[in-house]
Each structure stands twice: as C-alpha cells, then as structure tokens.
Amino acid sequence: MQSLPCSIIIPTYNRKKFEKLIEYNILCQTYSNILEIVIADDGDDEMLQLNVPYSINYIKCDRMTIGQKRNLLASKCKGFYIAHMDTDDVYLPTYIEHSVSILENQKKDAVGTSDMVFIYPDGKTGSMRNPLLSMANEATLVYKKSFWDEKHFAESQSSEAIYFLKGRHWQTAHSDIKKVMICICHSTNTVDKNVWKTCPEVELPYYEKHKEILRAINLIS
C-alpha cells in the first residue's frame, strides 16, 4: 500500500546557523512520500537555502507568535499528513515513518509525545517524562490535515498545542521519543532547558551524522 503524502512544516526566526541541521533532518527521513516542505520565516537574517529533493513553499511573513506561524503553515499544506519540524532539534530518520505508522495502526488523527530527551553543549544528556498528552511537545506532532481543519493552534508564543489537543485526547496517540527527536540545548532555545540538566543521564539513539553537523556549528563539543 502506498504511503499517503506528508507535508513538513518549519517555523523559523533567525535560524540561518541551523541550515545544515534542518536540511539533514529532512534528508534522513525514511518515510517514502514526503510531498513538500513549507517554511514560515519572520526573521531578519538570510533566507534558509535547503538542498532537498522536495518542493519548498517559503513564506516570508510579518512577525508572528509561534502559534500563528503554525496555523499559517498548516493552512498552506497540501499533504494528507502534516509533520512538525522545529529548526534546532535533531529529528531521527524514523520520525515521520514511526509517527504515521502509529496513526494508521491505531486509527488516530494525531500523534506526539510530551517526553523529551536532551543533549547539552558539554555532551551531558538528560530526559523528562510526562504522561500527559495534553502537554505534548509541539515539535513532535504529526497529524492529519483534517485534524487541524477542525481546530487550530492557540495564537500564543508557547504551549500552543494545549488548546489544539484539548478535548481531543481520544483522537491522539503517543509516540516513542527515541524514534522521534533529540532536543538540542543551546543559548537561544525558546524555552530554557537547563532545569533538566540535573536529571539522570540517558542513552541517546544513534545520531552520528547529526553529531558531525552539531559540532560544525558549535552546538556540542
């Protein structure tokens, strides 16, 4: 059975430094039917130049909250599925394939996780577990376009998915963070991640190629 088309949406603001990481996050995906990349950029630095074999819809927009940008991006998508990619995270090759498989096997409309694993500049790792899908990290979400059509993200600067998912938990499934992403902790994170640095270290999934890129842009030692 042929995979249904998936749009990847990327909100960005002054993230030129992360260009090669963003590019590899897209290129490494094992999902077989990526339709397009949709980018909303309200920054004032250079536009991202991504060498990927997919159509790119690059939207230069006025300054917006992250919730407004996610809604703008979703509104422009042509795919059956929408996959979020934030600019400063490692997305594992299995991310979209794993997420879509859960949607199809469990007959759900959205999937994500509130669990997180972290890598800090000094190489220390950390993790955070949260069983509440109402607090799912927006960066991990994959959902049917029709799910967004029914209800949009809150137009806020953070936690915009709480409203998006509220009252729809029965339509939402939980993904495995170690098949989805690794959060990179750095000085310009939207949310400070240092609070979790005291947590026990964890073994991270394999991400050697990503490591090379992170070292090249001085995000890890």
Predicted features, each with a name:
Residues L4-S7, E36, Y163:
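Cell-envelope/extracellular polymer assembly enzymes that use nucleotide-activated donors
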Residues N14-Q29:
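Short, well-formed alpha-helical segments that are part of the catalytic scaffolds
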Residues I39-Q49, D86:
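A conserved acidic beta->alpha catalytic loop
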Residues C61-C77:
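Glycine-rich, basic loop-to-helix element that forms the pyrophosphate-binding segment
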Residues K78-G79, A136-E150:
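Conserved nucleotide-sugar donor-binding
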Residues I82:
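Short aromatic/hydrophobic "clamp" motif used to bind/position activated sugar donors
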Residues T94-T125:
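Conserved donor NDP-sugar-binding/catalytic core segment of glycosyltransferases
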Residues H152-S221:
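C-terminal catalytic/acceptor-binding lobe
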